[in-house]
UniProtKB/Swiss-Prot annotation:
Gene3D superfamilies in the cross-refs: P-loop containing nucleotide triphosphate hydrolases
Biological source species: Synechocystis sp. (strain ATCC 27184 / PCC 6803 / Kazusa)
Chain sites annotated for binding GTP 1: G25, Q26, P27, N28, T29, G30, K31, S32
Mode of membrane association: Multi-pass membrane protein
UniProt-listed CDD domains: FeoB (cd01879)
Protein name: Fe(2+) transporter FeoB
């Protein structure tokens, strides 16, 4: 059973954890959904020495033991060559596990059995979860679980990670398997083993013969009917962009008003609690705590509801299976730009945060395509930029016009990305093609719990990550806008720094105060709002909005948003680009290219509006 494995020991960051379970599966199998369900969305990103990726891990008490669960990247082949496949290979080679849990989409078992047979070939202790078993029955897939289990010699458990059916039984089985398996194993020669014992198509057919019956490939399903409209060569793209306009309409009309109650609460806390509490302190320390740290933190809190609504809407779209269709629709266009549908998927991922989208380029085998994708992904209208744009546009545009302007910025993010890709793909450094396989899952209705767990995980990471940046950034902003003592406005350190760049920003209609906020936006885009609050010397975002409304025109505000959309990525994204590219020169290119592009786009927009007299 373990002839190809080598005994090892589990070395965890927690000394009380002695056993480890690794989850393996193809993309879109529901592996991460099951992982989130059993860990109650309490998984944390952990760094693993020797791997080029951070993996989700969680420590779960199970049958009297603390067990470390690790969610490995979704892969199609354990013997493949993509970066994600190499990550899984290195993990199993270097980190001992007591058990491997293979998650298989029961509706696609004829295609996913290969990965299961590869795990079986390795001889490592494993059990299999047949996810979406209920969905498989609806599609006419018939599986004799007992017969298939006997043939494979591996325990099989039908589950529905989405609804929780069978999950308790599966967890009990995992607990028993780990308890009965005191030894941990790793496979240092994994690639050689799979190369010497390849899984052929005949092996897959033999494993399923007589125990699995698949429906006719020509069977007409509801998904096929819907795809006839959604993927229509004429109507497909208009439907997609109409859907995205709906997303930004909801964000504008539901998310924007949600900031007002939070502003009221943070204002009350400052006036009635913090100011009396800090009054005995020296004036300079009061300024740091109230005008610096608290102002930045309050600005972050005011946009938490808006970002949560954004993640809810995107979670529904993603859970329904629609976003992968968008990649299919855009594949032909992306191909002309030297990219493919995967790059578009990563652009969509960048709506949440650019960092995981940058890391997602590992699925591309071609280095040229990876580098080009990493260069254009930061143009995505991420949740951090979204806060800034909603804030500025609400101040300079009334009603639904602001939602339209927000949607135009979304479109401009693609225009900028496509323009840069079209130009740079002509250079040999970025030229390469890579086979592209896209799995189109059936349309599904996301459950409340599924969306909630997704949003909870995203928001927890969002607040945790940005709290640090807000405290540091707001403190730095307060210092630079408060010193030298007695100076105000452009006489401060921040004003002097902004004055250096102002000659470049004047043709864009961006005033000195906005210029200073852009400088601080390099740390994190959300800091721009805190920067404006501190720079204007006001204590809440509503007062800043009124100030911008009276001093900034629509053309100036939109030009500022357009520049902020495209210019230099935030510090965390740059760190991800450096880590993925392993090249300081390329990282410098990823700074210079968006800066030049942002200036040109904003210049053309603002000068055109000025020429028209708007």
């Amino acid at each position: 059973m373990v002839s190809h494995c080598q005994r090892g020991s589990v070395q965890s960051s927690r000394p009380d954890v002695k056993k480890r379970v690794a989850f393996i599966g193809q993309p879109n199998t529901g592996k991460s959904t099951f992982f989130n369900r059993i860990t109650k969305a309490n998984a944390a990103i952990a760094n693993w020495p020797g791997l080029t990726v951070d993996l989700f891990r969680a420590v779960v008490p199970l049958q009297g033991e603390l067990i470390e669960f690790v969610d490995l990247p979704g892969i199609y082949d354990l013997n493949g060559f993509s970066e994600d496949e190499r990550v899984v290979q290195r993990f199993l080679a270097n980190y001992a596990v007591n058990l491997v849990v293979v998650v298989v989409n029961a509706a696609q078992i004829d295609r996913q059995i290969r990965l299961l047979l590869q795990v079986q070939t390795l001889g490592i202790p494993a059990i299999t979860l047949l996810n979406l078993a209920d969905e498989a029955k609806r599609y006419g897939v018939q599986i004799d679980v007992a017969a298939l289990q006997e043939r494979l010699g591996l325990p099989l458990y039908p589950i529905s990670a989405k609804y929780g059916t069978g999950c308790s039984r599966a967890m009990d089985a995992i607990g028993r398997a780990v308890k009965d398996q005191p030894e941990a194993y790793q496979i240092p020669n994994l690639v050689n083993v799979l190369s010497d014992h390849p899984v052929a198509i005949a092996d897959m057919e033999t494993a399923l013969a007589g125990v699995v019956q698949m429906p006719s490939p020509n069977a007409r399903t509801l998904t096929n009917v819907i795809d006839g409209v959604m993927l229509h060569p004429v109507f497909g793209l208009p439907i997609f962009f109409a859907s995205m306009f709906g997303v930004f309409w909801v964000i504008w009309h539901v998310g924007l008003p949600s900031a007002d109650p939070v502003d009221a609460v943070t204002g009350w806390v400052q006036s009635n609690i913090l100011e009396p509490l800090f009054s005995p302190l020296p004036t300079i320390l009061q300024g740091l705590l109230l005008d610096g740290i608290w102002t930045g933190f309050a600005a972050l809190l005011s946009f938490v509801p808006l970002v949560a609504i954004f993640f809810i809407v995107m979670g529904i779209l993603e859970g329904s299976g629609y976003l992968s269709r968008a990649a299919y629709l855009m594949d032909a266009l992306m191909g002309r730009l030297g990219l493919d549908g995967r790059s578009f998927v990563l652009q969509m991922m960048g709506f949440g945060c650019n960092v995981p989208a940058i890391m997602g380029t590992r699925v591309m085998r071609s280095r040229g395509m990876r580098l080009l994708s990493m260069l254009v992904i930061p143009f995505s209208l991420c949740s951090a930029r979204l806060q800034v744009f909603v804030f500025i546009l609400a101040a300079v545009m009334p009603g639904t016009q602001g939602a339209i302007a927000l949607f135009l910025l979304y479109l401009m993010s693609f225009v900028a990305a496509f323009t840069v890709a079209a130009i740079l793909s002509r250079f040999h450094y970025f030229q390469a093609r890579d086979p592209f396989v896209l799995e189109l899952p059936p349309y599904r209705l996301p459950t409340f719990k599924q969306v909630f767990l997704r949003v909870w995980g995203e928001m927890r990471e969002f607040v945790a990550r940005l709290s640090m940046f807000m405290v540091i950034g707001s403190s730095l902003i307060w210092f630079l806008t408060s010193f030298p003592q007695g100076s105000t406005g452009l006489e401060t350190f921040a004003g002097r720094i902004g004055s250096v760049f102002q000659p470049l920003m004047n043709p864009l209609g961006i005033n000195p105060f906005l210029t200073i906020s852009l400088i601080f936006g390099f740390v994190a885009k959300e800091v721009q709002i805190a920067a404006l609050t501190v720079i204007y010397g006001l204590n809440n975002s509503e007062a800043v909005s009124d100030q911008i409304h009276s001093t900034v025109t629509f053309a100036q505000g939109f030009s500022y948003c357009l520049f902020s959309l495209i210019y230099i990525p935030c510090l965390t994204t740059l760190g991800a680009i450096w880590g993925e590219s392993k090249s300081l020169a390329y990282t410098a290119i990823s700074v210079a290219t968006p800066l030049v592009t942002a200036w040109l786009f904003s210049f053309i927009f603002y000068q055109s509006f000025s020429w028209l007299g708007w």
